[in-house]
Amino acid sequence: MEYRTDQVPMSPRSVQGAPGTLPIRDHLPWSIFNLFYMNVCCLGLTAMIFSVKSRDRKVVGDVEGARHYGSTARSLNIAATVLGILLIIILIGLAATGTIQALKYKG
């Protein structure tokens, strides 16, 4: 194989942010998960709205607004996840004790 001089070898580059700044997180994947699987009291939907607002603020360049909306989305996602897990545990406990039954056989 012949090496051509008119081609420049490509190497992966990493983009460095400003030193001392933390990346702005919008928690969008977590919000999508909570929207579709653990939408307790519409907390997943609200978290999704705040995640999108955070991403929009990040695109515009409003760092403080993006951090605020991202923090709110994080708090709502935590609440939705905890309430969803508690609901699942309560339902499993009620089903195990026989308080609720999924199917009744009428024979």
Curated annotation (Swiss-Prot):
GO terms for cellular component: plasma membrane. It comes from the Eukaryota. Residues 53-77 are cytoplasmic. This is Dispanin subfamily A member 2b. The chain crosses the membrane at residues 32-52, 78-98. A lipid is attached at C41, C42 (S-palmitoyl cysteine). InterPro entries: CD225/Dispanin_fam, IFITM_antiviral_protein. It is a multi-pass membrane protein. It holds the Pfam family CD225. Expressed various cell types in torpedo electric organ and muscle, especially fibroblasts, capillary endothelial cells, and axonal cuff cells. Residues 1-31, 99-107 are extracellular. Keywords: Cell membrane, Lipoprotein, Membrane, Palmitate, Transmembrane, Transmembrane helix.
